[in-house]
C-alpha cells in the first residue's frame, strides 16, 4: 500500500471539492482524509495500491467541474498512521 499526500491549489474551496474528492476516493477504494487548508488549498492524504493512487492523481489534476485546479503537489507520506474509510475533515 502506498501513502501519498496531495495539496491542491486553485479554486478548490466553496465549490464542493472535498465532497467530490471523497466520492472519487470512495469509488476507487482509497482510505484517507481530505480537508481545507487556511491558505485556500485542499490537503489530501490517500492510501491505496499504485493503480488506485494513479487513477486518483489523474482525477485530482482537474477535479470536479465546479473547481479550477491550478496545480497539485504530491509527496510520499512517511507517517505510521493507518487510515480507515476515506473521510472529509472539517
Curated annotation (Swiss-Prot):
Keywords: Hydrolase
GO molecular function terms noted in the UniProt entry: acylphosphatase activity
EC number: 3.6.1.7
Keyword Hydrolase carried by entry: yes
Tree of life domain: Bacteria
Matching InterPro entries: Acylphosphatase (IPR020456), Acylphosphatase-like_dom (IPR001792), Acylphosphatase-like_dom_sf (IPR036046), Acylphosphatase_CS (IPR017968)
NCBIfam families given in the database record: PRK14448.1 (NF011019)
Protein name (record): Acylphosphatase
The gene coding this protein: acyP
Amino acid at each position: 500500500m502506498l501513502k501519498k499526500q496531495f495539496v491542491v491549489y486553485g479554486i478548490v474551496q466553496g465549490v464542493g471539492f472535498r465532497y467530490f474528492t471523497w466520492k472519487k476516493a470512495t469509488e476507487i477504494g482509497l482510505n484517507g482524509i481530505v480537508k481545507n487548508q487556511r491558505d485556500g488549498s485542499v490537503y489530501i492524504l490517500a492510501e491505496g495500491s499504485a493503480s488506485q493512487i494513479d487513477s486518483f492523481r489523474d482525477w485530482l489534476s482537474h477535479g470536479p467541474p465546479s473547481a479550477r485546479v491550478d496545480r497539485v503537489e504530491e509527496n510520499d507520506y512517511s507517517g505510521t498512521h493507518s487510515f480507515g474509510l476515506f473521510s472529509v475533515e472539517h
